[in-house]
Amino acid sequence: MQMLNIAHRGAKGYEPENTLQAFQKALDLNADGIELDVHLSADGHIIVIHDETIDKMTNGKGFVNTLSLPELKSFLIAEKHEIPTLNEVFDLVDKKCLINIELKNFDTFSKVVDLIDGYVSEKNWKYEHFIVSSFDWNALQHVHDLNQNIPIGVLTETDLNLALAFAETIKAKAIHPYYHLLNEENTQKIQEKGFLVLP
């Protein structure tokens, strides 16, 4: 089975994580895909950042969901990079690789589904260009209920068998196991059930 090179939060060994520059570097390095994390801003924009606050990554402070997009854009990562929106990442990638969107909390699912649907219907993308993943299985269930064409990845760091059962229920495309669950036996178990392994 083919090994995919997925740039976790972009090529963060070269550029600050979850920035347009990190994602561009991943494209330059011919990554098969990128992984990123999303939260919602106070005014409903999908923001690409790992933490629920901007404290660690920027020169600002505060929770992402309490700040508007203009406020978030006013703070910089590594003194020069803006926090990107998911739209900006989609436009940058432009169908060149897979985009794995990790929902960091429940309230992001409907906006992400709407955005993916828009790019498929209006910009000639395919659903296969995306995979939506989360530790919040309730959010993944809602993604499945809204649009069964969107590929789903089930994240787990504890019970692999439970994750496999849930993945079968929602017809997921992949299992995203935490690294300590990754051994030959578990990898084989996941693949035998027809799922991709995307740790």
What residue ranges belong to the model's regions?
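Phosphate-group recognition and catalysis centered on beta-loop-alpha active-site segments
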Residues: M1-P199
